[in-house]
Amino acid sequence: SDATINHALTPILKACAYASEMKMIDHAVNARIQDMRIASKISLSDEDNEFDGKYLSKEQMSALLEYYSTCTEPRRKEFLEMFFFAFHACGLRVVDVMTLQWGHVNFEKKELRKIMIKTNKRHVIPLTEPALHILHRWQEKRAGCRYVFNLVKDDLDLDDAEALYKACNNATKCINQSLAVVGEQIGLPFTLSMHVARHSFAVFALNKGLSMSVVSRLLGHGSTDVTEKVYAKFLPETLSAEVARLKEDFASLEIV
């Protein structure tokens, strides 16, 4: 199985990582070797209605950002930029990151308008400054290109379901292989993937006090019911914070 192969590769990959740190082999060579790890297969039809508990805390996100700042492998650095873009673009799904076109981005209004691949519905996402910063970086190297990120070919026909599936499945595999290596190197207790960016945004937003209905709209869920089902375990913390806001007024009504 893929898991057995990955287990067998682990000692080799660790040895290569150590050799790279000791400058015994080139960083780029090591990066290619690390990408031999087999990533989990992703289906475009997978609904994100099952939360596997994998999300990054603020500390883990900071560690990932620190890794990015010192990363010397160009392609891996690009994959990390895509991960951070997905997070900052309100948890944009990986398939929509891949198929994002410059025509979908309005820099003046600071928003993204796109028909989501999964739901086939038009979705408007407000773009934060970090998301815009990443887009500007890619604008410099993707001038004249149809798609924002170089994950699919410019001639990809989005109406060709089979071609879209193959292109996105291959791209997802490449990104997740690279991210899995990064996750291991920063000591994450789970496998890092693009979908973790989506869950991380949702958890951050809920714990910052955004309402379930707002988070649901930002994620592009069909209904609030889906969002509640997926992130129900994070509601108590948010609800406790809401009740805490009543503390001062309630204190004067306390029975003593």
Features from the language model and the residues they span:
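Conserved tyrosine-mediated DNA breakage-rejoining catalytic core shared by Y-recombinases
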Residues: Q34-D35, T99-E140
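Short, basic (Lys/Arg/His-rich) helix/loop patches that form interaction surfaces
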Residues: T70-R75, N176-R217
